């Protein structure tokens, strides 16, 4: 319940621009957010490993 209310609160926007923060649209996670992909690290890893994000490959060196 608390997580759902925080997601709705983040979508609403705030009175001041500085208080807004990014959340993952898939899971709602506020931390470890990648702007380039518009998702959190966990969802990014899950989708990249299944090949659903074009251009992202697993690196090996």
Swiss-Prot record:
Binds 1 zinc ion per subunit. GO terms for molecular function: rRNA binding; structural constituent of ribosome; zinc ion binding. PROSITE patterns: RIBOSOMAL_S14. Its cofactor is Zn(2+). Zn(2+) binds at residues 24, 27, 40, 43. GO terms for cellular component: cytoplasm; small ribosomal subunit. Disulfide bonds: none annotated. Keywords: Metal-binding, Ribonucleoprotein, Ribosomal protein, RNA-binding, rRNA-binding, Zinc. GO terms for biological process: translation. It comes from the Bacteria. SUPFAM superfamilies: Glucocorticoid receptor-like (DNA-binding domain). InterPro entries: Ribosomal_uS14, Ribosomal_uS14_bact, Ribosomal_uS14_CS, Ribosomal_uS14_sf. Belongs to the universal ribosomal protein uS14 family. Zinc-binding uS14 subfamily. NCBIfam families: PRK08061.1 (NF005974). PANTHER family: 30S RIBOSOMAL PROTEIN S14, SMALL RIBOSOMAL SUBUNIT PROTEIN US14M. Part of the 30S ribosomal subunit. Contacts proteins S3 and S10. Binds 16S rRNA, required for the assembly of 30S particles and may also be responsible for determining the conformation of the 16S rRNA at the A site. This is Small ribosomal subunit protein uS14. It comes from Geobacter metallireducens (strain ATCC 53774 / DSM 7210 / GS-15). The gene is rpsZ.
